[in-house]
């Protein structure tokens, strides 16, 4: 592909942190903390993950991908950063998780190879790091089987999300390294819904992901002002 739908600076951020991906006290602590919540949410809405072929787009070091494999899914994790993928492969080997594979490939390229081959496609905490989110949504639609499930998560774009996701998370609480997020790449739910419809997916549910920094507790609620997750289905034959 002559022009990849990637931001090299975004990839470099996570490449530099790759060795810490499975350290639950590192910059990736928030991903470890939210993972049980998002895993159960995906598992329930997909009608169970066991025995299904699952693709995790923008998998990084494999926190979600490996947890889905542990639920019995046959998982492929893809990412454009080689260092996080190497970490994911090593961790799966150390934990003897055999039903998982990792590849460095753009999702648009994989869509040309494996159209309609996946029961479930996940793309979590990744949409706000690419130049063209709509292209990602379309590729995910291509990859999932008719009747299959596609899940996304991202961050809303408004003053509240800037305050919470950037000022609060990166500068005040220091949950994330400074510069992790670019406010202008955040995606409003209306924009997300537009891309979903244009791709030929049916929006089933949109829910907010919330965090209390005092109790360090995460929960789901209807408010989608900051972080939110989306469940879609590919209808038709």
From Swiss-Prot:
Per the UniProt entry, the Enzyme Commission number(s) are 2.1.1.222, 2.1.1.64
Root EC class: transferase
Q: Could you give a single Gene Ontology term from the biological process aspect? A: methylation
Q: Which residues bind S-adenosyl-L-methionine?
A: 38, 58, 79, 124
Check the record and name the HAMAP family matching this protein.
UbiG
Stated family: Belongs to the methyltransferase superfamily. UbiG/COQ3 family.
Q: What name has this protein been given in UniProt?
A: Ubiquinone biosynthesis O-methyltransferase
């Amino acid at each position: 592909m002559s022009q990849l739908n990637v931001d090299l600076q975004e990839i470099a951020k996570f490449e530099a942190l790759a060795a810490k991906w499975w350290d639950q006290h590192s910059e990736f602590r928030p991903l470890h903390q939210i993972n049980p919540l998002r895993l159960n949410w995906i598992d329930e809405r997909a009608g169970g993950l066991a025995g299904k072929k699952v693709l995790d787009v923008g998998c990084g070091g494999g926190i979600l991908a490996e947890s889905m494999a542990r639920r019995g899914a046959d998982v492929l994790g893809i990412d454009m950063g080689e260092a996080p993928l190497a970490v994911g492969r090593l961790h799966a080997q150390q934990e003897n998780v055999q039903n998982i594979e990792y590849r460095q490939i753009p999702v648009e390229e994989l869509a040309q190879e494996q159209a309609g081959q996946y029961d479930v496609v996940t793309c979590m905490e990744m949409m706000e790091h690419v130049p063209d989110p709509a292209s990602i949504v379309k590729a995910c639609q291509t990859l999932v089987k008719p009747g299959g499930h596609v899940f996304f998560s991202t961050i809303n774009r408004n003053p509240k999300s800037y305050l919470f996701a950037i000022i609060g998370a990166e500068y005040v609480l220091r949950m994330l390294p400074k510069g992790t997020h670019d406010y202008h790449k955040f995606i409003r739910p209306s924009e997300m819904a537009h891309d979903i419809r244009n791709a030929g997916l049916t929006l089933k549910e949109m829910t907010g992901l919330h965090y209390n920094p005092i109790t360090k507790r995460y929960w789901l609620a209807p408010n989608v002002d900051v972080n939110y997750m989306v469940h879609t289905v590919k209808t038709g034959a």
